[in-house]
Amino acid sequence: MLEKRLLRMGMRLQLLRDRRISSRGPGLHRAKADPQQQKRLTTGLMTQAETQKEAQQRQAAMRKTALWHTGHLQPKTHTHTGMHTQTHRERERNTQRLRDRERRENGRHTHRHTHTLTHTHTHRDTHTASYRRGIETHTTRQPLRLRGSAHDENDPRVREQPRGTQADLSSRSRMAARLLGRLTPTNTVRAGLRLGSRAASPDPAWGFLIVVGPL
């Protein structure tokens, strides 16, 4: 008898353990169902969920179609994903930018815009034009050449000139100094004449300036 009772209690505990039911009662949790029955229920629930999802998708498609026909919704003809939809304020801002750009292209600038563009444009163009004119018109600085120097001898332009011209200039300056010495025979003027004759150069004006200038 005792063995039978122990066997029954063991079977009962095993059954409770399989069903995960506390010895104090079933409690709030549901009993563990049969695996085959659970699989059948899961398949049925999945089928029902798929059916409901398809029905909701069809209803949403019908709503979109109705909105397209009434013009309240524009269809997405592009294939880009993740594009930002412009709001009404952004659309108005972009439209205003396009208007400003067209106004600038047509020449109807505002005062502020005209002042900025005119100043920058004039300033830059003036400097660029003057710089270009300076490059085109101004030649490189020529070195100072003295007659009778080494540079003068190597210069083809000077070599082409006859030496008789230089001799004529020096003789003319000496003749002018002699005439002035006869007109004003003073020691001071004679000293100036000597200095002028010594400093006689290809340009006769140098000796003349030394003679006439105040001593």
UniProtKB/Swiss-Prot annotation:
Query: Which pairs of positions does the record mark as disulfide bonds?
Result: none
For bias type Basic residues, the affected ranges are 109-122
Q: Where is the composition biased (Basic and acidic residues)?
A: 87-108, 123-139, 149-162
Q: Where is this region: Disordered?
A: 74-172
Pfam families documented for this protein: FAM27
Mark out the compositionally biased spans (Polar residues).
163-172
Q: Determine the domain of life of the protein's source.
A: Eukaryota
What family classification does the UniProt entry report for this protein? Belongs to the FAM27 family.
Protein name per its UniProtKB record = Protein FAM27D1
Gene transcribed to yield this protein? FAM27D1
